[in-house]
C-alpha cells in the first residue's frame, strides 16, 4: 500500500491552488475573480461569515474606535478579486470575513508592538498580500517583504501593484530566489 495515500487529495488541492494563482496572473478576467475561484478558496479566502463576526468582535474588544476609524480603508482589500462579502451588525455596507481576519491580525500586531515603530516587515507565506494591504492602512512601514512560492509571489506582485501607496514599498520574493535578508 502507498504510504502517501492520505496525501493525494492534499497534493491535488495544492496543485489547483497554484494553477489558480498562475491563471490570475496571466488573465485579467481570472484576476478580477480570483478570491471567488473554488481552486483558490481551498487554501485562502475561505473564512466563514461567523468566523468573520468573531474576528470583528475581537478587534472591537481591542480598540473599537480604531475599527470604525479605519474600516473603510480596510475594505479596500475587498475591491479586487471579487471575494464573498457580508453585512455585519453596526457596519455600513459589506466586508469579506478574510479581511476581518487580516484586521484581527493587524490589531494583534499593534497590541504586541505597543506603539513601537516598525520600518520593515517580512512575511513568509503571505497569500495574495491581503495582510500587507490591511496593515498598511494603520502602520507606516518603509518596506514589506513577502516570501512565497513563485506562483504566489507573482500574484502578490500583481495584486499589490494595484495600490499606488504600496507599489514601491513591497518586495515579493519567490522562495526559490531569496538571499539573506539584511536589516
Feature map (PLM): residue ranges:
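Intrinsically disordered, low-structural-confidence terminal and linker regions
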Residues: 1-2
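Conserved Class I S-adenosyl-L-methionine-dependent methyltransferase catalytic core
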Residues: 15-116
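Conserved class I S-adenosyl-L-methionine
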Residues: 117-127
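Conserved SAM-binding loop of SAM-dependent methyltransferases across substrates and taxa
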Residues: 128-140
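Class I SAM-dependent methyltransferase SAM/SAH-binding core
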Residues: 142-167
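S-adenosyl-L-methionine
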Residues: 158-182
Amino acid at each position: 500500500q502507498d504510504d502517501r495515500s492520505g496525501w493525494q487529495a492534499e497534493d491535488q488541492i495544492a496543485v489547483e491552488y497554484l494553477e489558480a494563482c498562475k491563471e490570475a496572473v496571466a488573465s485579467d478576467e481570472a484576476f478580477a475573480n480570483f478570491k471567488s475561484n473554488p481552486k483558490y478558496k481551498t487554501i485562502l479566502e475561505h473564512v466563514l461569515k461567523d468566523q468573520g463576526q468573531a474576528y470583528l468582535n475581537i478587534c472591537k474588544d481591542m480598540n473599537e474606535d480604531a475599527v470604525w476609524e479605519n474600516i473603510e480603508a480596510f475594505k479596500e482589500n475587498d475591491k479586487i478579486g471579487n471575494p464573498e462579502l457580508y453585512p455585519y451588525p453596526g457596519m455600513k455596507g459589506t466586508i469579506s470575513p478574510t479581511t476581518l481576519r487580516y484586521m484581527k491580525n493587524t490589531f494583534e500586531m499593534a497590541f504586541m508592538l505597543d506603539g513601537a515603530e516598525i520600518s520593515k516587515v517580512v512575511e513568509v507565506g503571505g497569500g495574495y498580500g491581503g495582510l500587507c494591504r490591511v496593515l498598511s492602512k494603520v502602520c507606516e512601514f518603509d518596506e514589506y517583504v513577502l516570501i512565497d512560492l513563485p506562483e504566489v509571489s507573482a500574484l502578490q506582485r500583481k495584486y499589490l501593484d494595484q495600490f499606488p501607496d504600496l507599489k514601491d514599498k513591497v518586495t515579493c520574493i519567490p522562495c526559490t530566489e531569496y538571499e539573506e535578508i539584511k536589516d
